[in-house]
Amino acid sequence: MSYERRKMPNKGEWAVEAQGLIKNFGDNRAVDGVNLNVRAGSIYGVLGPNGAGKTTTIRMLATLLRADAGSTRIFGHDVVKESQIVRQLIGVTGQYASVDESLSATENLVIFSRLLGLGRAEARKKAVELLEEFDLTEAAKRPLKNFSGGMRRRLDLAASLIAQPPLLFLDEPTTGLDPRTRNQMWETIRRLVTSGSTVLLTTQYLQEADELADRIAVIDHGRVVAEGTVNELKSSVGTSSLQLSIQDPKEIENARQKVEEVLKVRSIVYPEGGKITAPMEDADRVTDLLIAFRQSGIQLAELSVQKPTLDEVFLSITGDNKNESSLNFSKQ
C-alpha cells in the first residue's frame, strides 16, 4: 500500500456504520448483534469489562476479522467488498505494542514509514516529526528494550499515525499505564480529533470514557446494552448520586446493605477508600437513610449528593455484580 495523506472527511458524516455484527468462536458467541454509528470528527467510546467483546468488535470493524453476520461501512465503504480502500482510511493501535523492541524508536518509525511507501528522506522526516509530537525525541536512539510501558505505547500510537488516517481505532490504549502517562495519552487523542481525525476507543476505564468520549456504547456479553452521550447515560440511572464513607471499615458491608434496602437500588463499594456510591432518584431519601444508620449504630465519616457516575450507569444497566472485578472503577 503506497503512502498517501488522506483528505479528512466532513464533520458529521458517518465514519462507522455497523449493523448486526455477529462473531462466534466455536460455541461461544463473542459478539451478538452489535450496532454502532460513529460520526466523523468525534471520539466514540466502547465501554465494557474484559471479555465483553470490545476487541473482537474492533477487529471486525478494522478488516482484521470477518464477521459471521452483519455489515460495516467505513466512510461509506464496505469492509468486506472494499477492504483495500478501508485499510487506507484507518489506523489501528492495540493493547500490546506492535513495535520491534530490538530497534530504536527512530528505526521503528522509519521502517513503518518505508513499508507505507515513503522514500528514505521522507521516512526520516516523518519519524522526527512523530517523535517530537509524542515527546520521545530524547529517547529516539535508545533501544526499545529500555523503554517504559508508557513510552512503548506512545511509540505504537505514533506508528499508527504515519499515514495520518481519518479514522483511528484505539483498543484499550492506556491499559497498564500510570496516571501521568495516561493523561498524556488523553491529550494526544484530543489533539488528533482537533486536527480532523475520528477516534473509536475501547476501554475498561470508566473515567477514561467520561473524560474523552462524545458518545459511549456500553457492551456486555457481546451486546450493546446502552448508547448515548455521557450525560444521557448518567441521566438514565437517576438525577443524583449518593457518595458516603463509613468511620469503621468493618461496617462497610452493613452500610451497603442499608443503602440498598432504603434506596431500593444497587450500590458500589470502593474497598481502597471505604466509599459507597449509589444512584438516587429522590434526595429526600437521605433522611430515611440517616435514620436507618443511626438505628443500626453505623457512624458516617462523610456524605454527599452529586451527579450520577458512569460506575452507577454500568452497574444499573448490567445488573451484574461480577462485572465489578473486571471493569475498572478506580479514578485514574
How would you describe each model-predicted region?
Residues 26, 139, 149, 247, ...:
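Structured loop/turn residues at secondary-structure junctions
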Residues 77-80, 224, 249, 283, ...:
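Short, surface-exposed acidic/glycine-rich loop or hinge patches that mediate macromolecular interfaces
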Residues 187-280:
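ABC transporter nucleotide-binding domain
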Residues 1-22, 320-332:
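ABC-family P-loop ATPase nucleotide-binding domain
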Residues 13-16, 23-220, 224-226:
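ABC transporter nucleotide-binding domains
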Residues 263-332:
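Non-catalytic connector elements of ABC transporters
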Residues 71, 143, 241-243, 299-304:
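Residues at or immediately flanking beta-strands
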